[in-house]
Design a protein with these regions (language model features):
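Short, intrinsically disordered, charge-balanced linker/junction segments flanking boundaries
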Residues: 22-29, 390-392
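Short amphipathic alpha-helical patches
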Residues: 229-237, 317, 321, 387-391
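P-loop NTP-binding catalytic core
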Residues: 255-370
Length: 392
């Protein structure tokens, strides 16, 4: 009997020792993981984005009751956790306040925890070597600097200052069109000759991380601007077409690979003062990213699931913008249209710029004053609603 008890005691002690040892090793591994392993890729956008995702996931899923906090501290931490969850959800609805909160949190994480400084911040975006900056990098910097001065009028100010809404001829097009090219963005960046502080650089990096994590990809900041609207995926070749020609036309595929033929995920258009302007220098990068934006941009107030059987959704965003989203098989590709109604009112003289406009404007005014029944037709973004409701 004594021998049996002794054996049981040895077994229990052995199991207890194994559990304690495993716990200690696990804690040591966790501490080792918490330390940032610095290498050549540590401060790239992709790696920092994964770090931000992991940290925010840890913060929102931590069990506060296991930490042993005081009652007051527990209440405070619970409120902060609730606010964070609410803000992360509100980001996808277009709430600019939630967006600002999350961006400030990401800024603190990168600066205080991840160790981003004046030197390594340029590993994410090569701020100090303009020749290595992409058109999107330059545009992000331009928009950030103008936003500091003009707020949500930043993009309209850039467009008006450099006449980016004028008709122009571009290579491969027989007719003039409304388009903003990467060459124009590079020229603007060179002329502006911005001097960026470390805070400016880190804020640009934070915005880039945010827009691929919780934002609307390349259009995230543009959507907030005071413009008439924005759309994506509405032109260019869909993935379904690319797969069909994959085994038939090698020359055509080589043109696509060189980005000479625009894809649907390269399609970004803004509506500005009644003009549909293509942003040729911007892209979602892949159909998966365009799909992610489409799946998030319409979800304010839970309008229902966008599915193969229900291939479109019409809804409003939190700021009152109207959003329409379509998906295959109803459409050839994923696409969205966002119309904003909080822009400055344009006059008829600004909208109608063709010869003989005075007579057309006077006629329209008298028809409205006479309470006549009028049918207003035209392409998307030509301000039919504004005329109908008397805003113009």
């Amino acid at each position: 009997m004594n021998i049996t008890n002794l054996i049981l005691m040895v077994i229990v002690l052995g199991v207890a020792f194994a559990i304690v040892r495993r716990f200690i090793v696990k804690r040591q591994n966790e501490e080792a993981e918490d330390k940032i392993q610095v290498d050549d890729s540590t401060y790239t956008l992709n790696v920092m984005t994964e770090f931000v995702k992991k940290r925010l996931d840890e913060i929102t899923k931590i069990n506060l009751y296991d930490i042993g906090l005081s009652e007051e501290e527990l209440k405070r931490r619970k409120n902060k956790k609730y606010e964070l969850k609410k803000a992360l959800k509100g980001c996808t609805y277009g709430d600019v306040n939630d967006k600002k909160y999350i961006k400030e949190l990401i800024y603190d994480m990168l600066f205080n925890e991840y160790g981003v400084d004046e030197i390594n911040v340029s590993k994410a975006i090569p701020f100090d070597i303009p020749s290595l900056l992409t058109a999107q990098d330059k545009f992000d910097i331009i928009l950030y600097m103008y936003k500091n001065e003009f707020g949500y009028e930043a993009l309209p100010e850039v467009i008006k200052k450099y006449n980016l809404d004028d008709l122009k001829y571009v290579e491969g097009e027989a007719k003039p069109c409304y388009v903003i090219t990467s060459e124009e963005i590079s020229k603007i960046y060179e002329q502006e000759n911005f001097i960026l502080t470390f805070e400016d650089k880190l804020n640009v990096v934070v915005q880039r991380i945010y827009q691929h994590y919780k934002g609307y990809s390349s259009i995230d900041e543009i959507r907030d601007m005071n413009i008439d609207g924005i759309s994506g995926g509405v032109s260019g070749l869909p993935e379904s077409f690319l797969s069909q020609v994959a085994q038939t036309d090698g020359d055509y595929l080589s043109q696509i690979a060189e980005h000479k033929v625009p894809r649907a995920c390269d399609s970004i258009w803004i509506m500005f003062h009644g003009k549909s302007i293509r942003l040729a220098f911007l892209s979602f990068g892949s159909e998966a990213e365009l799909k992610r934006v489409c799946q998030n941009i319409y979800k304010y107030n839970n309008p229902g699931q966008l599915s193969d059987t229900n291939g479109f959704k019409i809804n409003e965003m939190k700021d009152g913008s109207r959003v329409v989203v379509v998906r295959p098989s109803m459409s050839e590709t994923w696409a969205f249209f966002v119309r904003k109604f909080d822009v400055k009112r344009a006059t008829l003289e600004q909208i109608i710029r063709f010869p003989g406009k005075d007579e057309a404007i006077d006629l329209l005014k008298y028809l409205v004053k006479g309470a006549r029944i009028i049918s207003l037709t035209g392409e998307q973004g030509c301000r039919k609603n504004n005329n109908a409701y008397g805003y113009d």
